């Protein structure tokens, strides 16, 4: 399955929720998911638009067979009861992700690899400033996060070269990289998006608010601070995109690109 963001945005997607809070999140997701249909519980406030349902179990079968992607905003247990009985095989089941109503977590629930739920979870999490929860073993074993900052309009090939050369010089294998991470101010940098796509590595954005809130012992970039009010991009993004991280490669600058590497302690 094509894991490119553009493919996710154009895929037929069902957005489902049981609550007003969930409906507000659905509205936010509509801006990035073009080919979507909204399903709202009958008790959701009438100001929200969407097809209404009384019982999720009554419509889950049709949704499961009709959509490539399913985003359910509500309790994971409800999603499991509604869709779990319908699962057949990872090569044909739709991608299902679950989001809590406060947008803290986006869980890749079904068809993580073949169905694209892992990629979908990251796209949704980036947009909602949430934490993607991906438990497939291949991804879980990866322990490196590459933080990247770049000058505006830098070509993807330059970013790819900066990442690959940094990892090579440090004797680090690309297969260990779980995320390429950057600050949310870089979301529209096509060179960065294309570089991550070329390398086949998920691109994770860290909120500027989170970067300014945390204090770590890394070198402050005067340029980044003067332009964006941030202490840096590459190092804090690498650290904050993971859990129990330590910076193992301090930032390195090359041709308008800054790269840093953090390692997660997974033991």
Feature roles, as predicted:
Residues 7-20, 145-149, 182, 245-251:
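Short hydrophobic beta-strand segments
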Residues 18-191, 256-267:
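Conserved mixed alpha/beta catalytic, RNA-binding, or beta-rich assembly cores of soluble enzyme
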Residues 39, 133, 202-206, 248:
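General small-molecule cofactor/ligand-binding pocket signal
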Residues 115-126, 220-235:
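A polyampholytic, Gly/Pro-enriched intrinsically disordered region
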Residues 128, 198-199, 243:
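Short, structured coil segments at secondary-structure junctions
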Residues 1-9, 157-163:
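Short N-terminal or domain-adjacent regulatory/targeting segments
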Residues 234-267:
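C-terminal edge-of-domain segments
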Residues 196-225, 229:
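Conserved phosphate-binding/catalytic loops in two-lobed NTP-binding clefts
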